[in-house]
Structure formats: structure tokens, C-alpha cells
Amino acid sequence: MSLVCSVIFIHHAFNANILDKDYAFSDGEILMVDNAVRTHFEPYERHFKEIGFNENTIKKYLQCTNIQTVTMPVPAKFLRASNVPTGLLNEMIAYLNSEERNHHNFSELLLFSCLSIFATCKGFITLLTNGVLSVSGKVRNIVNMKLAHPWKLKDICDCLYISESLLKKKLKQEQTTFSQILLDARMQHAKNLIRVEGSVNKIAEQCGYASTSYFIYAFRKHFGNSPKRVSKEYRCQRHTGMNTGNTMNALAI
């Protein structure tokens, strides 16, 4: 089972360059680190202790806390917490990493407690949920952040810290492609916009299309009807619904 993230307990202060940015980490500070950037901390391992969290543990935690796995794309890659009882946390991590860890339920509660340290940190749930989504789900979340953006495969790879060839391979394993995910997301957004926005030009722009004519072509190919035809159908449905409502009110009178 692959790791989603780690909780790191710093016992000696150190300075580090993480993702091309300089940081100063203090003695007693606690970090939650996305596994995608865990390798950036490897040169400083002598300065901290850690415990890793796999997908099963994260999923159970999210279920127990009743949290929906709806995320914002491109979350923070690590979180910082302070004012934590360091002595207790040190003992917890030591136990969880020891061979004496033979009480599953107790160990699970300790793991959940370590995660909950970051519950009030901005980006906490996003970091966790992005770690348990499928690769296609992660890509979908990223493009949904700003569908008007002219997304390229490289942009997604930069967000996920993954090579283009590996991303293509993983998406193929999930029987999809970046282009298909982007198209589906844009078309769904366009269909939603048509309900409230009358201008096809504006809808095309908000869905990331520089050419309105190409947007109309893509929309027709995807849904079998033009944007104007779908918009007209929505208006008719609303009008019919309003008339039905008025009739019912009249009958009630």
C-alpha cells in the first residue's frame, strides 16, 4: 500500500530548500508532508522522526470524521504545526515505529491523533483527499480549478510532480487520457453555464476556448446538439415548469 503522507517531528532545527524555496524549521515543530515531496526532506532525516500514513489509514480517518473527499486542486505540499505536546508526540511516534506495535485498534487511534494535530490547518483535508484520489481524479480536480486556463499536459505534471510519460501511463491504466478529462470537464462546465449564461462567446471563453466556432463544434460533437439548441431546450423546460406551477396554483385556489 503506497504512502499518502508523513507526519514529521523535528527534534533538531535545520534550514532546507524545499521546492526551490528556503525554509527554517524549528526544534519541536511538526510537519505533515505530502508523499509527492517527501524526497525533498531526505537529506535532513537526521533532524527528525516520522511516521508514514498509507491510503487505507487515510480513508478510514476520512470516514470516521465524516469528511467528504471533495478537494481543491494543487494543495500545499506540506503543513506546519506548533504548540504541540512534543514529549507525548515523540513517544507516540516511537511506539508506532516500534516492533511492539501489536494492538491494531490502539495503534490506529494513535495514527488518527497524529493526523488530527493538523485538523485546523488550511489545506489539511485537501492534502489528505488528493492523496487518495485516482490519478484521473487528481487531474480532473486541477483542471476544474480554472477551466478558462489553456491547460497543457506539462502544467498538470508540474502540479503533480510527475513526468509526462508517467502521467500518460497512469491515465492509460485508468482507461482515460488528459485530453479526454479536459474535454469532459469543459463540456460539463459549458452545459452548466448554458443554464444561466446567454452568450455563447462568453461560455466558450470561460471554458478555455479561444475560438467560439471550435467550441460550438466540440460541444455539438460531445452532446449531439449546438449550445443554442441546448439553451433553447432549457428555456422551454423552465417555461413549461413555470406554467405547470401556475396551473397548480390556480387549481389550488
Swiss-Prot record:
Residues 137-233 form the HTH araC/xylS-type domain. This is HTH-type transcriptional regulator YdeO. Gene3D superfamilies: Homeodomain-like. GO terms for molecular function: DNA-binding transcription factor activity; sequence-specific DNA binding. Residues 154-175, 200-223 bind DNA. NCBIfam families: PRK09940.1 (NF007407). Induces the expression of gadE and mdtEF. Could also regulate the expression of other genes involved in acid resistance. Induction: Induced by EvgA. The keyword Disulfide bond does not apply. It comes from Escherichia coli O157:H7. PROSITE patterns: HTH_ARAC_FAMILY_1, HTH_ARAC_FAMILY_2. Pfam families: HTH_18. The lineage of its organism: Bacteria, Pseudomonadati, Pseudomonadota, Gammaproteobacteria, Enterobacterales. The keyword Nucleus does not apply. Keywords: Activator, DNA-binding, Transcription, Transcription regulation. It comes from the Bacteria.
